[in-house]
A protein has these predicted regions:
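...the same signal can extend to comparable exposed beta-sheet modules
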Residues: 1-201
Length: 201
């Protein structure tokens, strides 16, 4: 719920969802802001009466007074759910209730892979010729946006509005490469092209 206060001026930004509820009986309007945060599944507990996952928050969660943001931990990072839907290290989107002080929803985030063409600090990036705006709660696995380099490969994760909420470096896949140990052309006395490779496995 949002009150008319200067402290709330920056609550709504790219990536926020605003819902308005009108009470006809009292002529009251309630405005709710739903922020989406990003995290990773650090563990899951299946052998209890109410199975749950533990979310490691990558983006900071806004506190009740809206003046500070913190990382959630302990029981606040738990979310009761069907743990079959998640694996450890999954990147997820979650919402958090300030009033209840708990996670309210968790879903797996959609991702896009590609080469970084360019980026504008604090605003957007272009990956594989497509521009994506930043969510207000964007986070980077490598610490800082300024650590990104163009022509390098990244995996970006999108919030429910299609904005970038998490950026990760694309893992090097050694199986896609081979070391050329020996080559032979058809002009040799053996009369055919040959190459000897050493694979990573």
């Amino acid at each position: 719920k949002v009150s008319s206060s200067s402290a709330n001026n920056k609550l709504v930004a790219d990536g926020s969802t605003v819902e308005v509820f009108y009470d006809e009986d009292n002529n009251d309007v309630t405005i709710c802001i739903i922020d989406t945060y990003v995290g990773t599944i650090s563990s899951k507990e299946e052998k209890v009466s109410d199975p749950y996952v533990v979310v490691n928050s990558e983006s900071l969660v806004t506190e009740k007074d809206a003046s500070t943001s913190v990382s959630i931990s302990g029981s606040k990072a738990r979310f009761e759910t069907n743990t079959d839907n998640f694996e450890e290290d999954d990147v997820v989107l979650f919402t958090y209730s300030q009033s209840a002080d708990e996670i309210k929803s968790v879903v797996k985030a959609e991702s896009v892979e590609g080469t970084l063409d360019k980026y504008t600090l604090g605003k957007n990036l272009t990956l594989a010729d497509t521009e994506y705006k930043y969510s207000k709660n964007i986070a980077f696995s490598f610490g800082s946006e300024t650590s990104m380099t163009t022509k390098s490969d990244y995996v970006i994760y999108l919030d429910t509005n299609g904005m970038v909420i998490y950026v990760d470096e694309q893992e090097f896949d050694a199986s896609q490469y081979a070391y050329v140990l020996y080559t032979q052309s058809s002009n040799s006395r053996f009369g055919k092209d040959q190459v000897q490779l050493v694979m990573s496995d």
